[in-house]
Amino acid sequence: MKVRFATIEDSNDILSWRNDSESRKNFKDSSIISEASHKEWFEDKLGSNKARLVVSELNKEKIGVTRFEVEDGSILVSINLSPHSRGKGYGSKMLLLSEEILDFGSKEKEDYYRAEIYKDNIASIKIFEKAGYVLKSSKDNILLYTKLIK
């Protein structure tokens, strides 16, 4: 498995994965995202010094994306695998490799990663726990997992 920073050429794949019905169940906004709205969001993230999108590939095929975003003194992390890559055990390796290439974090005084996961999203819970994230708190239907940045 290889990871790299996203480029504009990844936009359509990431939108397709985001709008997949299984993916949408696990987003705060579960509606279908328009191409125009996604394009604006995607270009904003690519140009931001506070966000990184990391694409994972296996045998030169894109299998998912990990998003990192500086927010509230920590780095918010989310992960989305392509529909054909789910359930194969790729998620935690994707996440760990993506963390390794990050070029911001503790340098900017963010000392931990943070993932907000729906309680019924068992696959994501397993991914983050396997990657060393620890349950910090629970509120309503959301679990907060954290991991110190090394």
Regions of interest found by a model, annotated:
Residues 1-9, 134, 148-150:
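Conserved N-terminal entry element of GNAT/NAT acetyltransferase domains
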Residues 82-84, 88, 119-120:
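Active-site acidic-Proline motif in GNAT/NAT acetyltransferases
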Residues 112, 138-150:
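C-terminal "cap" of GNAT-fold acetyltransferases
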Residues 113-125:
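Conserved beta-strand-loop-alpha-helix junction that forms the acyl-donor binding cleft
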Residues 129-139:
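Conserved acetyl-CoA-binding loop of GNAT-fold acetyltransferases
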